[in-house]
């Protein structure tokens, strides 16, 4: 795979640069589709698409096929491969009197598809065994996938976020992560123009939303944003940790009026809780049961629009007199709709126990190992509306 770790959309005349082509997704799924590729050059350039013998071919196209200076928004279009075998195209860049090539491979129908193709990179932990407080219970025989991304703070490698994956609806039923001043950070700033939307390397392009060219396309009059489950603003320690929040597996089609107002304020509220705690163990998720709506990703896949969103927060503070053994819990469950510009989160607050009943998910199963079953049960049963600290 030829990739670029961070691509800006600004073009220009780059003096004395080596001509290069960078393709984000290579090999390409049999289903084909569009993606951005980048060209690095300091003058006029052109791209020719050839087969392996140097002849023309028609199943790959590039637009524009010529230009001046570096560009990061060249559109590479690959048609669907109906054959069982893979096929290869040669992209030949001519610039500044030099030529360079990239071999683009498209998989055949025998090589693409299903959850059996999941490749978990070495070092991805077994979430049933890690014992992290934020990880929900994982039932035996589940059809969901479970993955975890890491980050490095200073010299310390730690977890960024973990998630379950619904291969049928193309969304994460839950995304779990620790939240504290330490891992939120405040070292970088993002501009909407340079948001690094990308596919998650744990899954094939066919198994997740492809959103790096543009946002969701609605099939109705409703407008959907690329809504984060782990917010980008929760990972501002460095670009590497923040980039991972833009993976398709962390994104759902979320109503713009919810994402940009009430939900954004709720995300800020959770960060404020973390800032006043040692650590908050957060689970953000969505429900798809009963949903009949979908939005289209950049290659036309139908991504289920969630019917509800929720947040579960387990707060720990060693110096608090609230809660039980330093822990207390709060959950918020929302229908997927417009809540206006308000911020009355208390109205939608419920206990962890109540959220478990609504979702069928066992939250914080590892808490009892730390503080005992009785204290853990009290944490999960506590009504957050009665605790002023949250509000």
Q: Can you say where each PLM-predicted feature lies in the sequence?
A:
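Domain-level detector for secreted/extracellular nuclease and nuclease-toxin modules, and
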Residues: 11-14, 92, 104-391
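Solvent-exposed, low-complexity, repeat-rich "mucin-like" stalks and linkers
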Residues: 11-15, 22-52
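Short, solvent-exposed loop/turn segments enriched in Ser/Thr/Gly
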Residues: 31-37, 82-90, 156-158
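Surface-exposed binding patches on compact interaction domains or structured appendages
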Residues: 42-75
């Amino acid at each position: 795979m030829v990739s670029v770790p961070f691509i800006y959309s600004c073009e220009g005349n780059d003096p004395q640069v080596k001509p290069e082509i960078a393709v984000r997704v290579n090999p390409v799924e049999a289903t084909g589709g569009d993606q951005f590729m980048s060209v690095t050059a300091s003058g006029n350039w052109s791209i020719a698409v050839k087969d392996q013998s140097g002849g023309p071919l028609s199943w790959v196209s590039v637009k524009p096929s010529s230009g001046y200076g570096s560009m990061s928004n060249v559109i590479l279009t690959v048609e669907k491969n109906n054959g069982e075998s893979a096929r290869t195209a040669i992209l030949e860049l001519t610039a500044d009197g030099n030529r360079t090539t990239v071999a683009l491979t498209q998989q055949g129908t025998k090589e693409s598809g299903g959850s059996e193709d999941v490749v978990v990179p070495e070092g991805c932990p077994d979430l049933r065994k890690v014992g992290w407080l934020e990880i929900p219970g994982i039932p035996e025989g589940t059809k969901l996938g479970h993955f975890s991304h890491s980050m490095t703070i200073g010299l310390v490698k730690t977890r960024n976020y973990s998630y379950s994956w619904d291969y049928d609806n193309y969304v994460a039923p839950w995304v779990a992560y620790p939240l504290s001043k330490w891992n939120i950070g405040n070292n970088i700033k993002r501009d909407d123009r340079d948001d690094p939307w990308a596919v998650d390397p744990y899954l094939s392009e066919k198994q997740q939303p492809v959103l790096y060219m543009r946002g969701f396309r609605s099939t109705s009059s409703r407008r959907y944003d690329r809504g984060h489950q782990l917010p980008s603003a929760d990972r501002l320690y460095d670009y590497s940790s923040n980039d991972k929040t833009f993976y398709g597996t962390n994104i759902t089609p979320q109503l713009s009026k919810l994402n940009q107002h009430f939900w954004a304020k709720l995300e800020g509220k959770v960060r404020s809780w973390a800032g006043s705690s040692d650590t908050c163990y957060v689970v953000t998720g969505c429900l798809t049961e009963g949903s009949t709506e979908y939005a289209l990703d950049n290659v036309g896949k139908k991504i289920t629009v969630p019917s509800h969103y929720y947040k579960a927060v387990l707060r720990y503070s060693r110096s608090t007199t609230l809660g039980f053994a330093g822990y207390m819990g709060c959950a918020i469950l929302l229908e997927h709709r417009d809540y206006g510009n308000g911020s009355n989160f208390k109205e939608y607050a419920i206990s962890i126990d109540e959220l478990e009943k609504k979702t069928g998910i066992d939250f914080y199963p590892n808490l009892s190992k730390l503080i005992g079953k009785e204290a853990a049960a009290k944490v999960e049963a506590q009504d957050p509306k009665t605790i002023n600290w949250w509000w």
